Amino acid sequence: MSSYENHQALDGLTLGKSTDYRDNYDASLLQGVPRSLNRDPLGLTADNLPFHGADIWTLYELSWLNSRGLPQVAVGHVELDYTSVNLIESKSFKLYLNSFNQTRFDTWETVRQTLERDLRACAQGNVSVRLHRLDELEGQPVAHFHGTCIDDQDISIDNYQFTTDYLQHAVSGEKQVEETLVSHLLKSNCLITHQPDWGSIQIQYRGRKIDREKLLRYLVSFRHHNEFHEQCVERIFNDILRFCQPETLSVYARYTRRGGLDINPWRSNADFVPATGRLARQ
């Protein structure tokens, strides 16, 4: 259980509550969650963040009407900057997108600008939006995370409660290494509903070698942990930086979609460019 799970800032969210679905445009459906909720317990403030990054969203269920009433469909790509005051709560995002369904817009650019404006207002930060026609995406192969997968280890695990203990004394040797490690076993739970969130994670670092067994045990310990996707990624980045002290670190997770949306946060203190192709489970 997260220390802020019952924080009053979460009381007004539609997440976990019965809601009506509206199909006419309504920007008020969007709801933000202060990033400070999980950053404060980690000792992170807006002026001392040890990373840069973004939350990358893919919008698979995006439709509206053109000026003549003909339905349009697109796949949206949204990038929400890490410096925004709020993250976007995903159920409210879904409800907001549904409100486009029976609304007429003159052009695709009007839709893009509307999304960008509303998301910026909710997040209180910088947001970029791209819309893709389906033929732009057809035939694209399923992507994969570059790196060494650490999942196929012959180990026994019986603890699924979150702990940073595994990262203590998790580095060895004085030699600096540079490697990229991947796991598809990341599973956490929604902060509010406790529904499972499934993800793959890529950890790229330069520093003393990190013990792969201990790192995997740490990642598996998220299995009963309740936090939003973005919060988990920041926690993982902060914990590895704190206990393993790499010179450079990048953490990137791609989660399976829910409600027509997938969320793919990344945080880095290096020159990191995230690959945005969907993975096998997305």
UniProtKB/Swiss-Prot annotation:
Reaction(s) catalysed by this chain's protein: 7-aminomethyl-7-carbaguanine + 2 NADP(+) = 7-cyano-7-deazaguanine + 2 NADPH + 3 H(+)
Binding site for NADPH: S90, K91, R258, G259
GO MF annotation terms: preQ1 synthase activity
Known pathway: tRNA modification; tRNA-queuosine biosynthesis
Source organism of this protein record: Salmonella schwarzengrund (strain CVM19633)
Enzyme Commission code: 1.7.1.13
Subcellular location: Cytoplasm
Protein name (record): NADPH-dependent 7-cyano-7-deazaguanine reductase
Complexes and interactors: Homodimer.
Chief location bin: cytoplasm
Family, as annotated: Belongs to the GTP cyclohydrolase I family. QueF type 2 subfamily.
Binding site for substrate: I88, E89, S90, H229, E230
The entry's keywords: Cytoplasm, NADP, Oxidoreductase, Queuosine biosynthesis
Active site positions: C190, D197
Keyword Cell wall biogenesis/degradation set for record: no
Keyword Magnesium assigned: no
